[in-house]
Amino acid sequence: MAPISSAQATPRLERVLPRADTAAEFFSPDYASARGRFRAAALRAGAALDTLPLAARGPRDEALTIDIAWLGARQPRRVLLHLSGVHGVEAFAGSAAQLALLAAPPPLPADGALVLLHVLNPYGMAWLRRANEHNVDLNRNFHVDNGIWTGAPPLYKRLDALLNPASPPSRDAFALRLAAAGWRHGVQAVRQAIAHGQHRYPRGLFYGGAELQPGPRLFIDWLQKRLGGAEALFAIDMHTGLGPHGKDTLIREPGVGSASVETLQAALDRPLSGGNAAPAAYTVRGSLGAALPGLLPQTRMEFVLQEIGTWPALRVISALRDENRWHHYGDGGLDHPSKRRLLEALCPAADDWREAAVMHGHGLVYRAACWTFGEKSA
């Protein structure tokens, strides 16, 4: 195929999908269904499939795997990589976007490949958790260069009892107490302390782990073996929860990527935050995006984290806190209000939100394909 042109970069979904008014139907009810649909769609699209099995099991004792669909050249010079499910329960939107991409992929040049990594944290998706089987936030776990697995932000230590009570979920005026902490320390300081990542409280929120986790380890091994020869890589890591409801926010990792902010914003037709662009809501330690250049040092790279906004931050952090308490101090079963609240907080049930998530996810890949495979990148 010829390289994708700018005119093809942002198609309306109804032009490339047979039933765009039902984009929400790309959403699956659970991990097992999502995995089955992804693998079937990959085979229909003529994609090659790689499967990376994990030792952890799902709630029905089902196998948990990271599945990777590969379209295009088997030894590509240019690669567009789309990842879903780094934060388990957030994978429902990323999985849906990947099904849409398999139904209507962008054109690929002879030396190009589109690679879709389906659910880096299948345990979290299967059990409706943001963290993995060891309570590790995988986007705080990629310490591949410095190997520092200790410590926590000083303010997190002061917030630990508020964030991580050693008891099942209960009414405890969390919102008022968090607001008081924001008044005392500053809202931005509290947000940064909570979300930055910590390695001191293994049962706490945003725990980065004490070692590299099985999912990231499998991913890194696969990445270096399969994509180590690529000259150029554009990676998109799709998440949910941050930003205005149903809108997408694009975040650039500090120090990753050679294109200017203005050039990349023009190519993607979206403003960027983070890096040299506008400030991000918070910075994190041990992110996947920050690790990528060191994993593929010979590859020219661009990376964007795409967030699809859901609900206000207080609702999201409250849902994360309740589910975490249920996991550690209840029985952790799926049939509990805390699980349903977390799913709604990070994957709203409304069709209009789900259609917007698919449109944003699918559209960004098309625009990134124009950048990656266009004549200027050849």
Explain the meaning of each model-derived region.
Residues 2-378:
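Structured catalytic-domain cores with a bias toward divalent-metal coordination
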